[in-house]
Amino acid sequence: MEPVVRLRGVSKEFPGVVAVDGVDLDILPGEVHVVAGENGAGKSTLMKLLSQVERPTSGEIYISGERVEFHGPGHARRLGVAMVYQEFALAPHLSVAENLFLGREPGRGGFVNRRAEKEEARGLLRRVGLEVDPDRLVSSLTVAEQQRVEIAKALAIDARVVIMDEPTATLAEKEIEELFEVIRDLTSHGRAVLYISHRLDEIFRIADRVTVMRDGKVVATLPVEELDEAKLVRLMVGREIGNLYPKPEAEIGEVLLRVRGLSRGERLKDCSFEVRAGEILGFAGLVGAGRTELARAVFGADPVDSGEIELEGRPLRIRKPQDAIEAGIGYLTEDRKGEGLALQLGIDQNITLASLPARLGFIGLGRERSIAERRREQLNIRTPSVRRKVQVLSGGNQQKVVVARWLETRARVLFFDEPARGIDVGAKAEMFALIGELAREGRGIVLISSYLPELINMCDRILVMRDGRVAGVLEREEFSEEGIIALATGVKETV
């Protein structure tokens, strides 16, 4: 079978860095070809070379047997290569139909035929399983719906290759399965899907072949049936990794945090739960179910209408995050770059930021550096200096800086909101080992995740949310993906 895309000896160099190093790759019509590897392996740069966002330093790229010269992303789209980015390239204040045909509007003589545009848009949306009005503004759509619009854009240009960069990063399990159905439909019509992912289980669910990159090079391309999880991880990181989800043998003690009847408008409705010392409590649910909203409400980041919070039997009055921090509650936000870190500050300053009130707002530079060095060693934060700005760190190391900050506050209860999102498999293993160690120390942990294997493997109990309410709490012996999804979607009644 003739490859729809062929790369031969493709390299990309930036000042001081070889991001892609002599890559050979064939992509076949009708296949899902996963590109896997740790952060910094070269996956995203390779996708940018294919979609002509970046110009290769050397090497040759062929599409349908024709050698391609670099002329930019518009040229790549005309050749039938479409890219669906993690951060969608949609105009939020235009309608769905306008986004689908932006720059290619149907009509004559400078006049747009809106009726034809809407009719064609409906057909494209049906093909990706999206039942929305083409006149709706993109800004009113959910993340999952916007992603479908991006895929419909690829169909609108009759793309032969659709590149998807971490497409499930912000999707719940039900939405992931719906996306996979769309992908299977694309490949059944002869289109190739080039798919970047960190998530091991979904690689085995969706891939036909897997190319593994490490340090800018291709280390293997194999049919998925020739791989298992251990072999794939070994190829990705170049070493053995133990259990990715090391369930801690922690002694579960008395109730640390008790929340009763927490409500906030339509977002949270009479939510109650408990977290015990040494326990990892999971929060599961679809996107928008209220998991993050509940954590933010307990932390004082969002106001509540009613409810009670107790820590170690003491009633708390939490009106702002500072109240929660002083009481001993920490929250590691899912948006570490937007809310969790001061990117322009050094690692040392970020680590001591939340604990300054306990030090009356003052800390000497020597003491600050000493604290940061201790946490760097404890958490294996990879950096030549704690004075470096946080923005230059990898996602996994940035996440460790956030953890170090909360350890410095001596928090008794820690909320981890999507702690593994956007970090590679090696960093994930370290992150979950750390969460387990914190539980063994007797802290109460709340783990919020859209990725059910994380919750099922790490948690002692799982609280499932639906439409702002607690739909049920499952004990460990009751865990199953089907049971969690049933509660989250309302197929199963509240328990």
Curated annotation (Swiss-Prot):
The complex is composed of an ATP-binding protein (RbsA), two transmembrane proteins (RbsC) and a solute-binding protein (RbsB). It comes from the Bacteria. It is an enzyme of class 7 (translocase). It is a peripheral membrane protein. One of its GO terms (molecular function) is ATP binding. Its EC number is 7.5.2.7. Coiled coil: none annotated. Part of the ABC transporter complex RbsABC involved in ribose import. Responsible for energy coupling to the transport system. The keyword Transcription does not apply. This is Ribose import ATP-binding protein RbsA 3. One of its GO terms (cellular component) is plasma membrane. Residues 5-240, 250-492 form the ABC transporter domain. The gene is rbsA3. It catalyses: D-ribose(out) + ATP + H2O = D-ribose(in) + ADP + phosphate + H(+). ATP binds at residues 37-44. InterPro entries: AAA+_ATPase, ABC_carbohydrate_import_ATPase, ABC_transporter-like_ATP-bd, ABC_transporter-like_CS, P-loop_NTPase.
